[in-house]
Curated annotation (Swiss-Prot):
Family listed: Belongs to the class-I aminoacyl-tRNA synthetase family.
GO molecular function: aminoacyl-tRNA deacylase activity; ATP binding; leucine-tRNA ligase activity
Entry's EC annotation: 6.1.1.4
GO cellular component: cytosol
Species this protein is from: Actinobacillus pleuropneumoniae serotype 5b (strain L20)
The protein's name in its UniProt record: Leucine--tRNA ligase
Gene from which the chain derives: leuS
């Protein structure tokens, strides 16, 4: 063992040993309890960032710990390799997306290996490889045959200049990112998977996931958005047309003063035929793409159609308006508006001078000022004919009953969740395995013709997908007759919805999954990834698992038992303002800092001497140029130090502030561990530990060791508070550094302690522990060493400290035997000099004893 800790000399050597010996290869073994630990797979963007490092370090700590406690651990890694960024990079670098992607994968794989993660690389999955997406295509054709896939028109962003579809992120302030042409909304046919068929189960099964964060479950519940209400049909005056609306508040039905419909509603189109102003308003509204999140805050705009709807219960006519806050793909594309009791309807009514009819009164009978706001709470009905005085529940049922009896309404459960649109008009994705025959019949690509391979040697022009631009690519035959292949590709969420299952059998070629392998390893025991995936990936991932179950491939209901959402990584951000008033962000690695006595930044300058503005700690990002390159940090400090800092600086689910001073502190701590093992290894124990022969000080030190083992085991295994586990090891190290090594039992206690420290640190800092384990004289590698177990008998204290109070004030502390009786404790306390002087010449009127904790005397003169 070298005297000095030098990570760059150790880490590559240890990593080579792991690779050559396939130490982390996972093999099904029904005699052992399995443990499947998975971090969300990365997009191969070119370089790892600190967010990746944090996610994967957490996963690796969990995996190594579970392996040490005797479980059969699977920890795989792969690449979510399709996606839009590759197309942009290919155009920019004049290369093909595939070439760019594969080069990035190789580079990033090297970075992952450099960090020492214990992956089974034989299970690596790359989602853009035909052997992977072949089975995704096959499964899609199976879903189509089951009636779970359909095609319908849907709105997309269309650039008329480039004649191409744009992804949302390619639309900048309503214009095309490439040519600045105003973007239009266009209806085109797209493929959908019926996730709505599973809405109820996706919702109710959230209750079966006690080890998922409540925040994620709440976000999914809201996204699925189950509501109970009534669908009501209004007739249109002077025509046979009908207008269905859905409401969750039938109690407000008598307050309807207008009906609002979406710009794309058939009635709106009909009304616009002879109304050029309305036609123009509709065109403008259709071309303003609105994210649902913006609906509440955006300016409400509308126009009267000239049509009137007949209220089914009062017979009164109410105007029909086109409004920009109603979306065609939500519910029926129409809403009954009750301005008195809905904030959005109220804003719109105030703007356009529409009637506001109060029909709900606060339960306490108080007056409400309708000039200021709508009253949106439940209450008591007024101005509602025979339904007056009913509360919400009574009115809901009574009005629903009446509408149903009149055949103009029906109770209905609705979901906010929409079917999953999986068509993308991009090139770099898996081709959708459908084709159209010359007589217009839409059919699936037969199994023997799968995969439909995406050509990889293409030239990107930055405008159109190469498979759309090449008329030859789509040409095929079906039953000997000409047909055309679909040129759209899958949404990349398709690949990431089932990769976790493919890891269980990546070399299996007889089908999508080997059910024996998949059902042995699944569900995932621990899944780790960011909370930003709560309503997209994590919902599709659950949905796909249920589809695979219903296809008879899997036998579990949910894909992952436990979910941990790691916090973001933040770093200081600095900028100066250019002469053109633009913020120029300077990397923290280029900044010279001055701090005050409390460590706060008081001055920051760049290499040119410019004074910079410190904008605080923000998420590491390219836009603020405050990302820290993990590779630079590993080269400077070592992988173990980076890993230790990542796990220690903050609880796993909270944000982590990157501080290089903290990284330096982590390196110093590992240096102290190294030095202590080195010092011990120069003069190791020759006698075995003899518990009976230990001195009081030796017993105390040994007690601290075993208490730390118990705490660290609980913190890593059950609580997942990795930072407190590390803090406990650091505290123990402080005691060990001060412990004497004067006799054989000193050394024997130290040998046991160091063996424990090295094993407890191993999941977090595996390279240094690999070396230290050998230095402690162990023949086998630490990779196969069992986790250290606390000795209960060592934690039993021989002595207890009892606090002694006289008339409520602490007057002394006495040490007593852990087996002392109450009378013995009282005698020792009364004999203590500090206590005795307060008991002299007084009468003890009461004694209260809390065993081995406190003794209290009440006295009077």
């Amino acid at each position: 063992m070298q005297q000095q800790y030098n990570p760059s000399a150790i880490e590559p050597k240890v990593q080579q040993f792991w690779a050559e010996n396939k130490v982390f290869k996972a093999v099904k073994d029904v005699t052992k309890e399995k443990y499947y630990c998975l971090s969300m797979l990365p997009y191969p963007s070119g370089k790892l960032h600190m967010g990746h490092v944090r996610n994967y370090t957490i996963g690796d700590v969990v995996s190594r710990y579970q392996r040490m406690i005797g479980k059969n651990v699977l920890q795989p890694m792969g690449w979510d390799a399709f996606g839009l960024p590759a197309e942009g990079a290919a155009v920019k670098n004049n290369t093909a997306p595939a070439k760019w992607t594969y080069e990035n994968i190789e580079y990033m794989k090297g970075q992952l290996k450099m960090l020492g993660f214990s992956y089974d690389w034989d299970r690596e999955v790359t989602t853009c490889r035909p052997e992977y997406y072949k089975w995704e295509q096959w499964f899609f054709t199976e879903l189509y045959k089951k009636g779970l896939v359909y095609k319908k028109t849907s709105t997309v962003n269309w650039c008329p200049n480039d004649a191409t579809v744009l992804a949302n992120e390619q639309v900048h302030e309503g214009c095309c990112w490439r040519c600045d042409t105003p973007v239009e909304q266009r209806e085109i046919p797209q493929w959908f998977i019926k996730i709505t068929d599973y809405a109820e189960e996706l919702l109710t099964h959230l209750d079966n996931l006690p080890q998922w964060p409540d925040q994620v479950k709440t976000m999914q519940r809201n996204w699925i958005g189950r509501s109970e209400g009534v669908e009501i049909t209004f007739k249109i005056a002077g025509s046979n047309a009908e207008l269905p609306v859905y409401t969750t508040r039938p109690d407000t039905f008598f307050g309807v003063s207008y009906v609002a419909i979406a710009a794309a509603h058939p009635l709106a189109e009909m009304a616009a035929e002879n109304n050029p102003a309305l036609a123009e308003f509709i065109r403008e509204a259709k071309n303003t793409k609105v994210a649902e999140a913006e609906l509440a805050t955006m300016e409400k705009k509308g126009m009267a159609t000239g049509l009137f709807a007949i209220h089914p219960l009062t017979g009164k006519e109410v105007p029909v308006w086109v409004a920009n806050f109603v979306l065609m793909h939500y519910g029926t594309g129409a809403v009954m508006a009750v301005p008195a009791h809905d904030e959005r309807d109220f804003e719109f009514a105030q703007k356009y001078g529409l009637q506001i009819n109060q029909v709900i009164q606060p339960l306490d009978g108080s007056e409400w000022d309708f000039s200021k706001a709508a009253y949106t709470e439940h209450g008591k009905l007024i101005n509602s004919a025979e339904f007056d005085d009913l509360n919400f529940e009574q009115a809901f049922n009574a009005i629903a009953d009446k509408l149903e009896s009149m055949k103009v309404g029906k109770r209905q459960v609705n979901f906010r969740l929409r079917d999953w649109g999986v068509s993308r008009q991009r090139y770099w994705g898996a081709p959708i395995p459908m084709m159209t025959t010359e007589d217009g019949e839409v059919v699936t690509v037969p199994m023997q013709d799968l995969p439909v391979i995406l050509p990889e040697d293409v030239v990107m022009n930055g405008v159109q997908s190469p498979i759309k631009a090449d008329p030859e690519w789509a040409k095929t035959t079906y039953n000997g007759k000409p047909a055309l292949k679909e040129t759209d590709t899958f949404d990349t969420f398709m690949e990431s919805s089932w990769y976790y299952a493919r890891y269980t059998c990546p070399q299996y070629h007889e089908g999508m999954l080997d059910s024996d392998e998949a059902n042995y390893w699944l569900p995932v025991d621990q899944y780790i990834g960011g909370i930003e995936h709560a309503t997209m990936h994590l919902l599709y991932f659950r949905f796909f698992h249920k589809l695979l179950r219903d296809a008879g491939i899997l036998n579990s209901d949910e894909p992952a038992t436990k979910l941990l959402c790691q916090g973001m990584v933040l770093a200081d951000a600095f900028y100066y303002t250019s002469p053109t008033n633009e913020r120029i962000w300077v990397s923290p690695t280029q900044v010279t800092l001055e701090r005050d006595e409390k460590g706060r930044i008081i001055k920051a300058t760049d290499p040119e001497g410019r004074e910079l503005v410190h904008s605080g700690m923000t998420k590491m990002s390219k836009s603020k140029n405050n990302g820290i390159d993990p590779q630079e940090m590993v080269e400077k400090y070592g992988a173990d130090t980076v890993r230790l800092f990542m796990m220690f600086a903050s609880p796993a689910e909270m944000t982590l502030e990157w501080q290089e001073s903290g990284v330096e502190g982590a390196k110093r701590f590992l240096g102290r561990v190294w030095n202590l093992v080195y010092e011990y290894s120069q003069n190791p124990a020759t006698a075995a530990l003899d518990v009976a022969a230990l001195s009081k000080a030796q017993k105390e030190l040994r007690r601290d060791v075993h208490k730390t083992i118990a705490k660290v085991s609980d913190d890593i295994g059950r609580r997942q508070t990795f930072n407190t586990a590390i803090a406990a090891i650091m505290e123990l190290m402080n005691k060990l550094t001060k412990a004497p090594l004067e006799n054989e039992q000193d050394k024997a206690v130290m040998a046991e302690a160091l063996s424990a420290v090295v094993r407890m640190l191993y999941p977090i800092t595996p390279h240094i522990c690999f070396e230290l384990w050998q230095a402690l004289g162990n023949n086998d590698t630490i990779d196969f060493a069992p986790w250290v177990v606390a000795d209960e008998s060592a934690m039993v204290e021989d002595e207890k400290l009892v606090v002694v109070q006289v008339n409520g004030k602490v007057r002394g502390k006495v040490t007593v035997s852990a087996t002392a009786t109450e009378d013995e404790v009282k005698a020792i306390a009364k004999a203590d000099a500090n206590v005795a002087k307060f008991l002299e010449g007084v009468e003890i009127v009461k004694e209260i004893y809390v065993p081995y904790k406190m003794l209290s005397f009440a006295v009077k003169a």
